[in-house]
């Protein structure tokens, strides 16, 4: 009997539909983030598989797999897991995030909401033939994508389809003749050449504050920085300094402060990004679609089935110690 525990509210989102995709006898338990309900600590301790997005080092004892139903793993203390426990993540969010990015980019060029609001009061500001509403086209713009993983590749393909000039900065070489490729050591140079800079990188020891004052300072006046990776990849203080006077714009979906049990609805930063008209802010929603949930649930099922059959797991972040 495979004992599977969904640890916390976020993880529980991926439980419906899992059972039908599993090939072995199993028992599924959903527990709270606080692990304070009746029998929850015992369930966590005895689980063969834990599905969760965070782990502080307490409670997991027998697990052979800690499966993240998400890409980011910066909230998981992997060293505190049992030696025989593998850690794997899941993707499947790249289509959703790419749609978010393109929607955000298009919204800066095609002001549908403002045009609708104005015309409802008889204001023809954007009418064809009028000089005030003349706008640029997305295909006249350039974008620099930081990271060439699942998200970066999905955005790249869509940006190219719109006719944008695409640059990519990545740790390893980018073999795509359609784009201008840069190493991460050339990040500052790339950021000075484009109209939009998009971060897609996860948060690791090497990516924290990768984009700081020097990199932001190299950007053109009026350029826009976007973040759908992890918030702290872009230095919080440097970013606010770069946008508060209006020189740069920003579209921010990932943050520095998140809801907690103690503060369920915090502002997303110590700085007042929310007061700036040149900054668009959203609550880490870019990848949250029914398609993402379905694809990630399928990944969880695939790894549980592989574990039961003794096969190699997919998306391994940390292999079990022998």
Named regions from a protein language model:
Residues 167:
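Conserved beta-strand positions in the Rossmann-like core of class I SAM-dependent methyltransferases
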Residues 33-45, 54-59, 177-194:
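Short acidic low-complexity segments
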Residues 45-121, 135:
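Phosphate/diphosphate ligand-binding glycine-rich loop within oxidoreductases
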Residues 222, 230-322:
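Rossmann-like dinucleotide-binding domain for NAD(H)/NADP(H)
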Residues 116-154:
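Glycine-rich NAD(P)-binding loop of Rossmann-like domains
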């Amino acid at each position: 009997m495979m004992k599977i525990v969904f640890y916390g509210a976020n993880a529980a989102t991926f439980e419906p539909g899992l059972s039908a995709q599993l090939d072995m006898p199993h028992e599924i338990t959903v527990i709270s983030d606080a692990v304070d309900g009746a029998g929850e600590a015992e369930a966590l301790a005895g689980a063969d598989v834990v599905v969760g997005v965070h782990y502080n080092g307490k409670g997991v004892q027998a697990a052979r797999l800690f499966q993240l139903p998400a890409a980011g793993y910066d909230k998981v203390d992997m060293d505190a897991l049992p030696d025989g426990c593998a850690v794997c993540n899941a993707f499947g969010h790249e289509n959703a995030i790419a749609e978010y990015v393109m929607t955000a980019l298009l919204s800066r060029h095609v002001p549908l909401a403002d045009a609708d609001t104005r015309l409802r009061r008889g204001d023809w500001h954007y009418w064809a033939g009028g000089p005030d509403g003349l706008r640029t086209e997305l295909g006249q713009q350039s974008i620099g994508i930081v990271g060439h993983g699942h998200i970066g590749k999905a955005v790249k393909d869509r940006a190219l389809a719109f006719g944008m000039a695409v640059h990519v900065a990545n740790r390893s070489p980018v073999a795509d003749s359609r784009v201008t490729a840069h190493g991460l050591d050339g990040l500052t140079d790339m950021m000075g050449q484009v109209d939009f800079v998009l971060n897609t990188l996860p948060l690791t020891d090497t990516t924290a504050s990768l984009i700081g004052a020097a990199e932001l300072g190299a950007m053109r006046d009026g350029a826009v920085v976007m973040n759908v990776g992890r918030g702290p990849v872009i230095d919080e203080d440097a970013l606010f300094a770069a946008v508060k006077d209006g020189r740069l714009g920003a579209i921010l979906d990932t943050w520095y402060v998140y809801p907690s049990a103690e503060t369920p609805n915090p502002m997303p930063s110590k700085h007042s990004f929310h007061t700036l008209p040149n900054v668009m802010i959203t609550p880490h929603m870019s990848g949250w679609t029914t398609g993402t949930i379905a694809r990630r649930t399928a990944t969880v099922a695939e790894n549980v089935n592989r574990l039961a059959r003794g096969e190699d797991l997919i998306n391994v972040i940390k292999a079990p110690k022998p």
